[in-house]
Structure formats: C-alpha cells, structure tokens
Curated annotation (Swiss-Prot):
<dbReference type="GO" id="GO:0005344">
    <property type="term" value="F:oxygen carrier activity"/>
</dbReference>
<keyword id="KW-0561">Oxygen transport</keyword>
<dbReference type="GO" id="GO:0004601">
    <property type="term" value="F:peroxidase activity"/>
</dbReference>
<feature type="modified residue" description="Phosphoserine">
    <location>
        <position position="102"/>
    </location>
</feature>
<dbReference type="Pfam" id="PF00042">
    <property type="entry name" value="Globin"/>
</dbReference>
<keyword id="KW-0813">Transport</keyword>
<keyword id="KW-0408">Iron</keyword>
<feature type="modified residue" description="N6-acetyllysine; alternate">
    <location>
        <position position="16"/>
    </location>
</feature>
<keyword id="KW-0007">Acetylation</keyword>
<comment type="subunit">
    <text>Heterotetramer of two alpha chains and two beta chains.</text>
</comment>
<feature type="modified residue" description="Phosphoserine">
    <location>
        <position position="3"/>
    </location>
</feature>
<feature type="modified residue" description="Phosphoserine">
    <location>
        <position position="138"/>
    </location>
</feature>
<dbReference type="GO" id="GO:0042744">
    <property type="term" value="P:hydrogen peroxide catabolic process"/>
</dbReference>
<feature type="modified residue" description="Phosphoserine">
    <location>
        <position position="131"/>
    </location>
</feature>
<keyword id="KW-0479">Metal-binding</keyword>
<feature type="modified residue" description="Phosphothreonine">
    <location>
        <position position="137"/>
    </location>
</feature>
<dbReference type="InterPro" id="IPR002339">
    <property type="entry name" value="Hemoglobin_pi"/>
</dbReference>
Length: 141
C-alpha cells in the first residue's frame, strides 16, 4: 500500500521525467531485452535493435500507462483495467516479466535522475511499480 509520502514521491519523480517518459520507457525495454533475453519472446515481430521505432513505440506505451497510473494512483485497478485484460487474456505475458521491467525502469530513472533518486524516492517508486504489476496481473486468476 502506498503511503501519502510514497504518492508524493512518485508524483514528484514522474513530474521530473516530464517529456522524456517515452525515451526512458524505450531505454528500460532495451535494458530488459539485454539483461533478460527471454523477454524477447513476447516481441517476435519487433526489430529489437537499439533505437528501433518499434521499441521506441512500445516504450512510449509503457510510459503512457505509467503516467496514467501516476494520475490515478488511488484507483489504479480501474484506470489500468483494459491493460490488465490485454496482458492477461490476449498477450498472456508471464507475470515475472513485470518485475523485470520494473527493475529496468528503476535503473533507467536512477541513471537519468541521480539527484532526485534518493533512497526514499527509490523505495516509493519500487512500491508503485510493484502495485502497477499487481494490478496488471490481477486478472490472471
């Protein structure tokens, strides 16, 4: 459960991401594909090379979903319901992959926002991404 301080930290950090959200989303995906090659199996139709338009496009989708979640932090299940359905019923993504991407997102944010990425912000973002992952996997059952 996100505390009021966590919500404040997440919103402040995401505000700092600003117009770079899509770029950071794509970078996190690239990190995931390089660090955890088995995740590539969900994207057989993508050009997964560095800077590909498909990775950039999906990175933007990831970032847009996170922006939506930040904006609806008190009602993520409702806000992310369609995305949860998509991943559970159509794409059938193994839930562990959300944890892998979350880790890569944290690394990406730490690299780009070193001054803002305090231990408290790190903990809040980690809890937030875990909450998003829980919502996205809630319809698997």
């Amino acid at each position: 459960v996100l505390s009021p301080a966590d919500k404040k930290n997440v919103k402040a950090a995401w505000d700092k991401v600003g117009g770079h959200a899509g770029e950071y989303g794509a970078e996190a995906l690239e990190r995931m594909f390089l660090s955890f090659p088995t995740t590539k199996t969900y994207f057989p139709h993508f050009n997964l090379s560095h800077g590909s338009d498909q990775v950039k496009g999906h990175g933007k989708k990831v970032a847009d979903a996170l922006t939506l979640a930040v904006g609806h932090v008190d009602d993520m299940p409702q806000a992310l319901s369609k995305l949860s359905d998509l991943h559970a019923h159509k794409l059938r993504v193994d839930p562990v992959n959300f944890k892998l991407l979350s880790h890569c997102l944290l690394v990406t944010l730490a690299a780009h926002l070193p001054a803002e990425f305090t231990p408290a912000v790190h903990a809040s973002l980690d809890k937030f991404l875990a909450s998003v992952s829980t919502v996205l996997t809630s319809k698997y059952r």
